[in-house]
A protein has these predicted regions:
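Acidic catalytic motifs of isoprenoid enzymes
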Residues: 1-51, 55-68, 75, 79-109, ...
């Protein structure tokens, strides 16, 4: 089923397939580097989102604004995924830039969540800055809600609420 849809998409948007293939190669290189850091690991997803979102631009100003928005949204998505998978990746010995970065720091779960939240907040501030420069014509109220409230609420849910729920269910977790 998905294969048929991919073929249709390839015919209509071949540049998107190229961008996604490039992401996969660059993501693999970033994660296999000798000393990967969080920004280096988030870069391929951020660059991919930038390229995809810029395709919607009608002029150079829109390209700049949408590029900034897409880049930092891609970075946020990568970081949120890594944050969400943190404990699972420790157990499965899977790659996770937060596990690598924080492995030798003796942090509590709350301290770790606050550190990651700070990185995400920096990223959200860049998303919001770019978003505020956009001329939104459709669905503005929905998009305002997503950018101004939804990103932060998702961070809270993943970084703090999930931990509290797990702690109350199984006892404290602090790998």
């Amino acid at each position: 089923f998905a294969r048929r849809w991919r073929k249709k998409a390839l015919k209509k948007y071949p540049e998107i397939d190229k961008i996604i293939k490039e992401l996969n190669v660059n993501q693999d290189l970033a994660e296999k580097s000798s000393a990967p850091n969080i920004d280096q690991c988030a870069e391929p997803t951020a660059a991919m989102m930038k390229k995809l979102v810029v395709m919607l631009a009608n002029n150079e100003t829109e390209k700049a604004v949408l590029g900034e928005f897409g880049y930092f949204l891609g970075k946020w998505v990568y970081l949120m995924d890594a944050a969400d998978d943190y404990h699972k990746d420790i157990k499965s010995h899977s790659f996770n830039p937060f596990v690598i970065e924080l492995a030798h720091k003796n942090l509590t779960q709350k301290e770790r969540s606050c550190y990651i939240n700070g990185l995400l907040n920096e990223t959200v501030s860049r998303i919001t800055g770019a978003y505020n420069l956009m001329e939104i014509k459709s669905f503005k109220a929905i998009l305002d809600n997503l950018v101004n409230m939804g990103l932060g609420q998702m961070q809270k849910k993943i970084l703090f609420d999930k931990y509290e729920k797990d702690k109350n269910k199984k006892g404290a977790i602090n790998p």
